[in-house]
Amino acid sequence: MIFGRHSVLKRGCSTWNPQQVPQAEFQARLDAVRQEMGRRNLDALVIYGDNYSFADLCYLTNYFPKVRGGIAVVPRDGAISLLLNIGSRDVPFAKTLTWVDDVRASNQVGGDGAKLLKEKGFDKAKIGLADSGQGFPLPQLEEMKSSLPQVAWQDCHSMIQPQRLVKTAQELSAMREAGGVLKEVCDGARDFIRPGRKEYEIVADIDRLARDKGAEDIRILTGEKRLNPPSFKQAANIGDHWAVYLAVQHERYWAEAGRTFILANDAKLKDAYTRAQEIITAMANQLKPGGAVAAIDEIAQRELGEFYATASVYGLANGIGLNQWEAPFLNEDDARQVGAASVGATTLNEHMTLALRVIFETEGKLVLFGDSFEVTASGAKSLLQDK
């Protein structure tokens, strides 16, 4: 799979627009989760999230950690509480990002989490633990469990993910917003990418443009022969072409794209880039309700031919949403690389969202094209539209 260096600190714009994703949206999600809790006979659910893997936590609360992590305590009945690894002075800001009223600061989420569960009367309960990113620091997790010796714990790491597969109208609107920001960044990057400029200068310009457009986070990989994460050591001047992978998080949701900028009159390179776009179109033609996820891979294999082995190393497709990489995945290996428990759905449904990408080499030069799509009744629809 394709990996960008993730931020230790999310330093981009952080807001919540209740008109775009209103509280009623979260209530519907909460009702569905509680229905599943009832089916599993759970009294409460503890959801962990951090700044790398926050999708399940955010799905119910709209909150995403900018540094470190936190938990949501979700009773089967009653109010949700958020316990976040932040300072008390940061609580007022955290409350602007969530509809949850009970937001608390903690520097020891495990121990304080146990106290919170006891406070709510769950010291002898059946409690589910959802930590799909497996990021809960082990010492803190062990402290929480050891402080509640009479609790019956149940792993629920994959419990919420199936509910996130099909996006609601509000989610799709948010993803189109993210796609619109990403399109502006892709278009604006053309002005920065010129022969003779140093790589780190261009990356800094792209990063600043994304932040100016309201991005919460951005992943950038670039290169002529291989994709590299940003580094001040990338002091070389770019040559006659540059491949750029971009993913932007905006209002919690991700959109992804890949572009190859050709700076010289190289007919073979231009033909290869055109071919990459044609292959993505062929793959996107498989994005129909009721279609098999595996068909995307089959078409890619047929269209890429000898380039398939190289392209598949980077990953050809995956779901996208609150996670940069989420179900459905094409195969178990792709899922395992990003820590997912399974490939997820094997059949496409309307309003699923996927990122498609093709990366291969021709005459020692990297060619990249990718886009993010919604599955609609009339076929694939790009999320990268003008705002």
Feature names for model-found ranges:
Residues 1-387:
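Active-site neighborhoods and metal-handling regions in enzymes and metal-associated proteins
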